[in-house]
Structure formats: structure tokens, C-alpha cells
């Protein structure tokens, strides 16, 4: 990190212009000045009357190390000789009201382990990265036409030691990475790792945006974890919260005694539901703080993506009864995405947005917000409501399973089965399923089959892969003992086979963002709650037929219209006995019958299992058959697919 002497910085660079290396000015930097080694402290506090640095090195005496104000707009700085890395410190701020308050450093790179709240001097230089091969691989294969399976996890509750203590960043290399590799996830998405005081905020209410939480080790330890993930071909996505922050007294809130990082207007400052305050995204210094922070994580931790939290809350003012968009947030998000993609065009910027805001994943130069992915919250809500409904009544809400294809190509979507849906009394995915014990497992297998065959990249929260029975308990680890039970082992085996099938099957991801990648066979069989469709790859022969039965009935000799290939093989059946099913499978090769059905040139007759998904693959083209043309009924979109930037 190249530290810039703040006295040499033009005021406009931080206060009025785009300046995305703020971390080189602010914070605590181990430096040598006039041949004397020490630490330079720099902070922005525009309404402070006076500033000091306090810590163990001066017995927390406010009078000893007074800072110098170096710009009229409130940049303060001080070089303290002969102190070293590892010193704990805070800023003592004399407010306009004459009070002295203690604050952690907004740009601190390291902090004390909670419940202590001081910042820690840390020299971030020195880690030697070994991930050049990973970087080359990313550039060679952009994600838009590749398989993408994201494992979302909470670092502190995935697994704990026998005594209940947390695994460190370095220890998780041995615990987590082999597990992720075994399950063939392409990425992990970690809930926020910025410093935060309250465990149960899960990291979403941060105080130290530049500090990797010390709960799990040092910043260099986290770098090692990311480096090892890249070594084994795993991308690392971080949850990042640029919209709001917590009100703890040592943090950013009323930093110099006045609203500094947050809006001044109380009507838009507060988030009463979360107990947080909103960043003032119209203030240049705040934008520089946040965008510098994003680039800091990219440059120093080699992060591969951000899931940007609570975008909906940013896009709209939270004044009661007001639907007006927040133009500060809109322009900030565009500026953020432009800066990120200028740094790394292969980065993943995913919006967690539940609104119908248009063009979220359209580049800014085409009038969009500039993200390249968006969580498909509509799909998630509709599908889970459908699955929670008693099977005999699903025919009355049939449209919940078909509606998503009307807008599936309006954005680049990720399908999230996320932490939000398995907490706060919502039940686990397994326990959402109606019916008896067997029914629950059968329907979860069915849900996963539909999930992996529906257009869009995939995200699953930890525990779902083996059928966690209880909802997520953030103070405990996952119920790993469930592997002692046969049905959970079956579920785990099924999930691993399903994700392996997904990764080796181009039709399931190659045209995720193009209408040509999906075609309904029959979307209208609400009476039997059966859905059938085709997933298509770039080549004609890269096609799969998917049939999903959302009732407990078994159907034999069921006609399914198919493209004209001579034979089909069933390559996965969720009802197979090895997955805990009843064994209603199609073992034999299925010969097509050259009679049109479901607007297809031919059809096959299959057994459809109870609560089952059957995936069929064509074996060979019929001799003399013509290439499929565009006459088949396809899902159309009036929005151009944006599968690349």
C-alpha cells in the first residue's frame, strides 16, 4: 500500500472529485518519516473542534497526541514516532458541543476482538499471492455461459469446534474448502466479514468496513483463505452493505458529533426496522469512502464478487408513504459499478433487489444500473409459496411456477434459495414441504431438480444440501449429525449427483440468459400439476427434456412431446431408490414415436414418479430428420438478452 501524505493531496480530490484510493490517505499507516519509523494517523471529521489519537501507548490521554487539521473541510492528521504494528487506538473527538467522544477508525484495517471496540494498527503489506492461474482462468471463461453454483454460508455457524469456539480463517481452509470441492460448487458467498460488534447482526450492521472481522483471525489469514479457495478453483463472493450501518457509539454514527457518514434529514436517515442509519450517498466523501472500500477488497483480498445487500432500500426513500426514488443512490450505484468493472471486467456484481426497477443488469452506458447479476427474488417467493401449498391445491396457483419465464430474460438472474428464507420462523426448506416424512424429502428433491433445470445461475444456503430439518440457528452450527440418518444421506447423495449433472450438462447453463435456451413443452397442465420443458445449449444435440410432477400421483405411459431424436435416456430420476424414492424410474431406453404432440415433432411415453423430476437426454438424431427450426413455441422476451457486458 502506497501511503500518500495527506498534506500533498489536493482538497478537491477527496472532497469534490472521484477519489477511489482513500485508504491510502486515511487510517493508520506504518511509515518512516524523516528517517523515523512510526505510524501516521489520518481521519476525516468535518465538524470536530479538536482531534487526538489515544491508546495504550499514551494511557488514553486526550492531551498527548493532538492532531493537525490539514484541510478546511476537516481532514486531520498526525505522525506518532516509535509506535508499531499491533498498537490499539481510537480517535478522541471534541465535538461542537464541547463533549469528547471516542471513535474507532473508519479506515482501520484491523480491530480488537469483540466485545472490545478499539482499532488496531496493522500493516497490510507483505502477503504473497499465488492465484495467477485462477485469474487467467476467469478471463478465459466469462461466467455468463458457464455453470455457476454458489454456496452461501455464514462463517461463524457453518461448523464449530467441539468446545463451541469458532474456526479461524486458516482452519476453515482445511474444513470448508474440501467440502465445497466435493460438492462441485463453483463459488462460495460469505455473509458479511466486515468488523461488526453484534454477532446476531450476521455482519450486516458494520462498524469497520476496511477491517476483516478479527473473530476469525487477521487480514493476512483471510487472504490465505481466499488464496487457497482460488487454488482449488473456488470463487469468493462477499456480502457487502453500502446502504446502511449500525448506530453503535464507537462506529460511524454521528462520527464527529454530527451526521457525517449518514443523511442529516431524520426522515431519510433512519431505518427503524433494522435500527440502522443510511449512508448519505449524495456526499462525495461518503461515495469515495464506499467505492474505495469496494476496490480495497478487490485489490488486497482478491475477492471475485459482491452481493450488494438491500438495493431496494437504497433505490427508494424510506419516508413513510413515499415511493420516490433516491437519485443519490441511483447515481451512486452506477458510479460504483463503473469503477468496479473498470478495475475487473470479470467481477461479479450481484444486486439483492426485490423491486421491479428496470435494467438492473444493463451496463450504465446503455442506461442501466450496471450490475451484471440480480437475485431473482420473484422466482424464489413464487416457487416457495407453491411448494408450501398442499399438493391437491397446487393446481389453483399453477401460474406461480410459470410466471417467472415471462421475465426470465429481462435481467441476468441468479436463483437464490438463501438464508433469508430459512430463518425467523420461516422453517428450513425441508420443513416447508407439506406432508409426511417421506413426502417432505421427495418434494425437496423435486424442488432441487426444478431449481437446477430452470434458467438462471444457482445459489443455495448452507445445510440445504443434506436437508437441514431445523431452520438456521445462527448461534449454533449445522446439524451435522443428520448424516447418521438414512434419508438425509440419500438427500445428500442426490444433491451431489444433481449438481454434478448440472455442471456437465451444457443445456442447463450455456444459454441461461437467452430465450433460445428454454422452451415449454407443456406449461398448462394445472389439473395434474405437471410441467415439462426443454433446456437447450448452443448445439442442436445439446438438449434436455425435463418433466416435473408436483403431486403424489404416479403416471404410467404418460405422453411427453419431444424434439425428433431417435431415442432418449433418462439420466436422472429423483424417485430412484438410491435417493430415498419409491423406484418409479425409466430404466430402458425410450424410443420416440414419430407422432406430433405438445407442438413437438414426436413424443415418448414415460413413467412419471410421485413428487418426481425426470431428466431425459436425446441419444441420437433420427436418420434423415431435419434440423429443428424456429417454428416451435418458445418463451419470448421483448428484452434483449445481456449475457455479456
From Swiss-Prot:
Its EC number is 2.4.1.18. One of its GO terms (cellular component) is cytosol. Residues 636-645 have a biased composition (Polar residues). The active site is at residues 309, 352. Coiled coil: none annotated. Residues 619-645 are annotated as: Disordered. Pathway: Glycan biosynthesis; glycogen biosynthesis. GO terms for biological process: glycogen biosynthetic process. One of its GO terms (molecular function) is hydrolase activity, hydrolyzing O-glycosyl compounds. It holds the Pfam family CBM_48. It catalyses: Transfers a segment of a (1->4)-alpha-D-glucan chain to a primary hydroxy group in a similar glucan chain. Keywords: Carbohydrate metabolism, Glycogen biosynthesis, Glycogen metabolism, Glycosyltransferase, Transferase. Monomer. Belongs to the glycosyl hydrolase 13 family. GlgB subfamily. Catalyzes the formation of the alpha-1,6-glucosidic linkages in glycogen by scission of a 1,4-alpha-linked oligosaccharide from growing alpha-1,4-glucan chains and the subsequent attachment of the oligosaccharide to the alpha-1,6 position. This is 1,4-alpha-glucan branching enzyme GlgB.
